[in-house]
Amino acid sequence: MVTEPSKVLDYKFLIGGRNYNMDLGKAKYISENTDFVKWKELSSRAKINLNLVHELHANTYATSTARIFELSALRCCIVSSPYQGLERWFEPKKEILIANSTEEVIEIYQTLMEDSELRLKIGLAAEKRVKKDHTARNRVQQVIDIIRKCQNKL
């Protein structure tokens, strides 16, 4: 989602987070230790934010880091690598875009970079969804519901 597209597209790619000592193409590695305030600023300014999923999350149904929810709350337009259960949280093609191949991700990047209204539309839809379905209150209620369900089985 980064290496090859950054070599063929004339866009600025910035990567933050852990440095996995991999070929980043022409992407610039920022830092592993970007504080949250700076991260919010960079994410909000970016035209496209990537959700790069580790193999563990990709292959374990409905697992994720908080990052996808944080980006959505910031109204970011997100392109994600695929993983099992993602559609449980966000509607693909409406609230998030999923790239399954290098060719597909290049096409998605080109489309988004040429269409600011589409980026805004996706970001707004993701923000609306996260504020509706993915708040701390929602998670607490889910835990309560699970506990009640377990108690009823006893």
Q: What label would you give each PLM region?
A:
Residues 148-154:
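Generic C-terminal helix-cap and adjacent flexible tail
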Residues 37-38, 104-107:
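Short acidic active-site motifs
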Residues 113-145:
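A charged, aromatic-enriched C-terminal amphipathic alpha-helix characteristic of glycosyltransferases
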Residues 92-93:
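Glycine-centered loop/turn motifs
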Residues 96-102, 111-116:
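Conserved acidic donor-binding segment of nucleotide-sugar-dependent glycosyltransferases
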Residues 2-6, 109-110, 127, 144:
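Non-transmembrane alpha-helical segments in soluble domains
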Residues 1-68, 73-79, 83-86, 150:
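Nucleotide-sugar donor-binding catalytic core of glycosyltransferases
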